[in-house]
Amino acid sequence: MSLMAASLLGGCASDNLKISPVNPDASQEARQLLEFLYSIRGRYTLAGQHNFISDPGRYDSVVFAMTGKHPVVWGSDFSFNAQGDNVRDYHHCGPMNLTSPWGECLPNNKSTEELRQGLVEEIKARHAEGRIITLMWHCCFPAECNDCNGSSIWTWKNRPPQLVWEELTTEGTRLNLQWKAQMNTVIPYLRQLRDARIPILWRPYHEMNGVWFWWCAKPGENRSE
């Protein structure tokens, strides 16, 4: 499956592209991946597996042990550091400062930088196998950057009110600057992947049409549609 994807991706010539990416500055690799995905639409379904940043090969290995094959889509999460007395309540999303969920789920004593750099190296290895890479980001509310109680992410009915959302999206406000500073913490790792010519299906703020995260279900001009 992985070799098939690598072969098809390699066969997408730039002068045959029919699909224009939203970002006109998208790399050639990103354009090839987009064209590949459109080329198999309605004909193939790609298997994928999410892996937690604290143990990025664990669940992929489980799939291989059960099937003898690796999913062609390999995913992970830039994640957050869970704080407080109820960190295990959020183990299902794999906070990066804890060992893999569904086990002991104990502090792993690794820094944010160490874990995210390890994620980059894992991605490079998986991409070399011909895998398609997708990354998400369970991120804290921007004022807390990368360290928060999970309830800062899973806010449910306590999602930010309109005034807070307007401050977040208004250029130059304190919260807007905190948001940009938070996003800047993952840029060095994304740049490494760009420089390694690895296209990423990048989907921060995922499930934005749900009702559980702080960024969910926001109508209006600056909505998460």
Question: What are these language model-derived features?
Answer:
Residues 49-52, 75-82, 137-141, 206-208:
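Short, flexible loop/turn elements at secondary-structure junctions
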Residues 15-79, 89-105:
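N-terminal module-boundary/linker segments of secreted carbohydrate-active enzymes
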Residues 10-11:
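C-terminal motif of bacterial Sec signal peptides marking the signal peptidase cleavage site
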Residues 86, 90, 95-225:
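Substrate-binding cleft of extracellular glycoside hydrolase catalytic domains
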Residues 1-2:
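N-terminal export leaders
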